[in-house]
């Protein structure tokens, strides 16, 4: 019989072990046995909590998405002004939070993106994540721009966030957060200063 209160601890151990395995050997090479060994549990524990490797990957992605949402909320909550520019910058800062740009997280995100093209559950998670980013950006741009301009600006900024992140992940180099934020901040200024004063 499992110990009471162990489920959240075990699940967290397995998620962290999954990210470590993906970081070291990649998603395809990260076997159930290898992940279980890293977590210090039996293979059966993974089946008990997650059904299979796909269930574990889905739980790991939910974990990363939850941390991404929390990072964005924290950056927004830290603002002393309710200014669209500041809020757009905070959204970018949350997307480039340390929880999202460390090696294990970046490689797990890459594996997730690749797997989401072939898994309906992962595809749905990816779409929810994409819509949340777009919606947050669009809401802020709409405070300064007409609807169509705001939608285009939000799509462009989401593309920049994803593109900067992806280029860094594929380069194998450490993510240059300061440089990425400078590029995003310049984009925000260009969008808000073209025709509209905000």
Curated annotation (Swiss-Prot):
The lineage of its organism: Bacteria, Pseudomonadati, Pseudomonadota, Gammaproteobacteria, Enterobacterales. PANTHER family: HTH-TYPE TRANSCRIPTIONAL REGULATOR BETI, HTH-TYPE TRANSCRIPTIONAL REGULATOR RUTR. Pathway: Amine and polyamine biosynthesis; betaine biosynthesis via choline pathway [regulation]. Repressor involved in the biosynthesis of the osmoprotectant glycine betaine. It represses transcription of the choline transporter BetT and the genes of BetAB involved in the synthesis of glycine betaine. The keyword Transcription regulation applies. InterPro entries: BetI_C, DNA-bd_HTH_TetR-type_CS, Homeodomain-like_sf, HTH-type_TetR-like_transc_reg, HTH_TetR, Tet_transcr_reg_TetR-rel_C_sf, Tscrpt_rep_BetI. It comes from Yersinia pestis. Residues 31-50 bind DNA. Pfam families: TetR_C_6, TetR_N. The gene is betI. One of its GO terms (biological process) is negative regulation of DNA-templated transcription. Residues 8-68 form the HTH tetR-type domain. One of its GO terms (molecular function) is DNA-binding transcription factor activity. HAMAP family: HTH_type_BetI. This is HTH-type transcriptional regulator BetI. Keywords: DNA-binding, Repressor, Transcription, Transcription regulation.
């Amino acid at each position: 019989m499992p110990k009471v209160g162990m489920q959240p601890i075990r699940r967290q151990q397995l998620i962290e072990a999954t990210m470590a395995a993906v970081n070291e050997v990649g998603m395809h090479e990260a076997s159930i046995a290898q992940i279980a060994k890293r977590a210090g549990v039996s293979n059966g524990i993974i089946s008990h909590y997650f059904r299979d490797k796909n269930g574990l990957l889905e739980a790991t992605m939910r974990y990363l998405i939850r941390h991404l949402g929390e990072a964005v909320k924290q950056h927004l909550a830290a603002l002393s002004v309710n200014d669209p520019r500041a809020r757009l910058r905070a959204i970018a800062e949350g997307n480039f939070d340390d929880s999202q740009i460390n090696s294990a997280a970046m490689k797990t995100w890459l594996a997730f993106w690749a797997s989401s093209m072939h898994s309906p559950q992962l595809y749905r998670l990816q779409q929810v994540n994409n819509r949340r980013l777009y919606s947050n950006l669009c809401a802020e741009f709409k405070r300064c721009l007409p609807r169509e301009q705001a939608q285009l600006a939000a799509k462009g900024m989401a593309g920049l966030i994803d593109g900067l992140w992806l280029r860094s992940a594929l380069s194998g180099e450490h993510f240059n957060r300061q440089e990425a934020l400078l590029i995003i901040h310049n984009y925000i200024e260009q969008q808000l200063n073209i025709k509209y004063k905000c």
